[in-house]
Amino acid sequence: MKRALVSVSDKSGLVEFVSGLKELGWEIIATGGTRKLLDDNGIQTIGISDVTGFPEILDGRVKTLHPKVHGGILARRELPEHMRTLEEQGIGTIDLVCVNLYPFRQTIAKEGVTMADAIENIDIGGPSMVRSAAKNWKDVTIVCDPADYGTVLAELKACGRTSDDTRLKLSAKAYTHTAEYDMCIATYMREKAGLNEKLFLEYDLKQPLRYGENPHQNAKFFAALRPEPYSLAFAKQIQGKELSYNNIQDANAALNVVRDFEQPFCVALKHMNPCGAAVADTIEKAWQEAYEADKVSIYGGIVAVNRELIAEVAAGMKPIFLEIVIAPSFTPEALEILSSKKNLRVLQVDMTPSSGDDMQYISVNGGMLAQTLDTSVEVLTPEMCVTKQKPTEEQMKDLDFGWKIVKHVKSNAIAVVKGCRTVGVGAGQTNRVGSAEIALNEARNAGVTEGLVLASDGFLPFDDTVALAAKYGVTAIVQPGGSIRDADAIAKADELGITMIFTGVRHFKH
């Protein structure tokens, strides 16, 4: 008679699974709470103590760590000496192990959990049985996921045993299960002990991608086990083609921009750089201003807003070729309009503010860099002014807006704004003057030549950017400060009647 050992914390689907085994003539060995559930449902089982001849002790900490359990699992059926040993010791074979582990991850996720609670939810016997069964996969079926119950039962009913291929896959899945479990425990204990010299990351495949950044590159999208709501991994795709690698990069950049704004805000991005952005009293006005900021670059880009997307905005977007539209919600009328663009990807994202402690990981050859995300949003005040000319109230609004935008432009980054709208963006140049020239020329080409505000993500190392800005109608500048030549930049600003604010914070983006 075939025997199965059952000991689970996640009891979903268990009664049906074990009932199926019983119908096939299997004998069921069960532990503690698992046995009670099965007995309560009229399924006859054998207690683990009846198999081992030893009682469960230490409040259940020791119950399956016994040769009569592990011998029955690990014995290789094709080796006569193994089978002879089992017979001599009175050990029966165990042909299927159905085990999942104490809910450690769920326990530590609870508010106010104590270390004592966490420790009591570290499984010892469970992982041992899982690993033993997974090691002997040629003879033993290991089932640690209720999602596999149906497959296992179907094969047992059809063939009397599971296939080699199924057992191998279940073995790999089991080792993944125990590895994830131990990694979670190790991470928790290392945090408690103040140890940080190792990094464990755990992600699940969310979707394979057609290709990577370029067609000759392979790519996949992995998601954190518990992604924060304000993320692409948590986003709901309402319509459109599957997201591509570049779509995901751009959409992620868009979310990072949007999260910095509380007023109605709209941003258009291309290659992860804002090309048009605006805040306004309404989301319709913000969209119109962002679109007017750069009607050329928005083509083939993505647009994100931080308010419900309404029909009027959707109607404005309809004639434009866009890859993605992102919003916290959409009116039915807006979705109806956007639905006419079948390939347009429409993403709904919960825009609840982030906790601010998210980590960013960048792969490098032979290693990985880790840093906290740059979620810092500085509050600019007139007291930050370092020049004789003090900012007006309107300039302060533009300085604040420009500072938030330039943070999300690739360095060296310059943003030129007016009326809380971008009028020029200079990104990714190897010198700051080059980025300034690009942004300022965009503003001039748009016919905006007076009352401009310039924002720089890094300090101005010389006074040349200040002098250049003045020629294009810039009257106020915001920058981190911190150069050994700050005095030169301040003197030039004073000479030209320009207001300058030092934030004391740099926002490089590579």
Where are these regions (language model features)?
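ATP-dependent carboxylate/acyl-activation modules
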Residues: M1-V6, L96, Y181-H510
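Non-catalytic interaction/clamp surfaces of large macromolecular machines
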Residues: P146-A147, T151-L199, I320
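N-terminal glycine-/serine-/threonine-rich phosphate-binding loop
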Residues: M1-V51
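Glycine-rich nucleotide/cofactor/substrate-binding loop typically near the N-terminus or early
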Residues: G33-P103
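Active-site/ligand-binding-proximal alpha/beta "capping" segment
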Residues: R77-I124, R131-A134, M384, K388-E393
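Hydrophobic beta-strand scaffold residues
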Residues: I28, T45, V140-I142, V346, ...
